[in-house]
């Protein structure tokens, strides 16, 4: 849930500081791709703060949507019906993009054609590149290193803790969109200053 709180904070910050965004850049912030999962944990619809999060409650159920599908295994990059998340086998849906949330992001991406995408997750305290079956895009390496230097997060080119299939980041890489994932250090903190520094560095790079 902390990555969602961070996204909302960025929305507020950019609304209050519009001149921070270079004139040639359009920024879209999607706070969460999984409202069902958020509702399982928070118990409310729409925006929330850290004060709304029940203490001591497991956040694992919030990983999955109402169909008990891991949405970050439902994209068209080496998709399989079953995938892994940590030590667990998880459902990746009936087929790639079987879930409405994954379809919504796919349709938005194909319509808007962003120059770059950044995901916020937690927790490992690092920024990761993305790849599918054709390797890492050179631009992805560039923005990963730029964000890493500005924020202080470790830069990691390949996630190798366990094999993943059907991830959104990999799908974006497969269609030629540079994508990085910033993993916050814990499941509670938003590390605002580090992430603000990283975003400012990306604005400077793309202006």
Give the positions of each predicted feature:
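Generic non-transmembrane alpha-helical segments
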Residues: 104, 108, 143-150, 201-205
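Short, flexible loop segments at boundaries between secondary-structure elements
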Residues: 141-160, 167
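Conserved beta-strand segments of alpha/beta enzyme cores
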Residues: 26-28, 154, 178
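Short, surface-exposed, charge-dense and proline/glycine-enriched linear segments
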Residues: 50-62, 148-157, 186-200
